[in-house]
Amino acid sequence: MSRNVDKSQTVLALYQEHKAESRRDYNRYKRPRVESVRDPAEAREWYKQTLREVGECTNRLYDPLLSEEQVRECNARVNQLIQESQRWSRHLRRFKQRQRPPVYGGVVVNGVRYIGRARELPEARKRPTAARQFTVKRAKYVDFSDNGDFSDNGDYRGTSERLRKAHGIAQQESVLVEPPTQQQMEEYLVERRKRQLLHQLNL
């Protein structure tokens, strides 16, 4: 009995998919392989459909009723859809058609994007501490000139002045100092060695 029901449901699904394909209903029938689509307009419709599904799955990832396993599965599905949408986007570029790249949001850890509640998963929190500190350090200290880049003539005084003011470092007066002579260096080294020996002997 169940076999007949499954068979009838399969036949019905195939029939509905065939009708949707004939009507070009991009919401109902199975997506073809990216490389098999030769019509730019059809490729664009499939691209839009993948983006809609990405949006639906992303909204679901904010559902507080989902279990941890459901969140993990839904996030994996979002990543699959994002990869598929990127393949459609590259395929459209072959037809000389460009589109604005979408902003997916979330965080990327080890090549996997975590969105919504998926950011609370244990694997999403495995971002190396050193990498976080490096990012914060760069964001805090790296600065650029007004035109967005350092000038070609090597003039970095303006940038240095802004950095000193930002971190409360007072500008010190420049003083020219004569470099020590060879004899002065030798006397200094002998004196330093003598102090080290006296310290070791507790004298």
From Swiss-Prot:
Record localization: Cytoplasm; Nucleus
Coiled coil: none
Presence of keyword Lipid biosynthesis: no
Signal peptide residue numbers: none
Gene Ontology BP, a term: generation of catalytic spliceosome for second transesterification step
GO annotations of cellular component type: cytoplasm; spliceosomal complex
UniProt xrefs under SUPFAM superfamilies: ISY1 domain-like (SSF140102)
Keywords: Cytoplasm, mRNA processing, mRNA splicing, Nucleus, Spliceosome
InterPro entries for this protein: Helix_hairpin_bin_sf, Isy1, Isy1_sf
Domain of life: Eukaryota
Family from the record: Belongs to the ISY1 family.
Oligomer status and interactors: Associated with the spliceosome.
Role summary: Involved in pre-mRNA splicing.
Name of the protein this chain belongs to: Pre-mRNA-splicing factor ISY1
Origin species: Candida glabrata (strain ATCC 2001 / BCRC 20586 / JCM 3761 / NBRC 0622 / NRRL Y-65 / CBS 138)
Gene name in the database record: ISY1
